[in-house]
Amino acid sequence: MSQLKITQVRSTIGARWKQRESLRTLGLRRIRHSVIREDNPQTRGLIAVVSHLVEVAPADASSAGTGGSKK
């Protein structure tokens, strides 16, 4: 199965409880935090709930081991 890189780009301030819980379920805790998840219907459903708070891109082999970006 393919994988997705999901990055939180907006804050949860003002977000509904279901949206906050969806971010936690995906493993996202802060802005610019990225996670790699399998591309399956369950993950796509969680992404649909918080699509305005995250960016989604296909995960390539070079980003598979990173938990986030460091500057």
Swiss-Prot record:
One of its GO terms (cellular component) is cytosolic large ribosomal subunit. PROSITE patterns: RIBOSOMAL_L30. Gene3D superfamilies: Ribosomal protein L30, ferredoxin-like fold domain. Keywords: Ribonucleoprotein, Ribosomal protein. One of its GO terms (biological process) is translation. Coiled coil: none annotated. GO terms for molecular function: structural constituent of ribosome. It holds the Pfam family Ribosomal_L30. It comes from the Bacteria. Belongs to the universal ribosomal protein uL30 family. NCBIfam families: rpmD_bact. Part of the 50S ribosomal subunit. This is Large ribosomal subunit protein uL30. It comes from Mycolicibacterium paratuberculosis (strain ATCC BAA-968 / K-10) (Mycobacterium paratuberculosis).
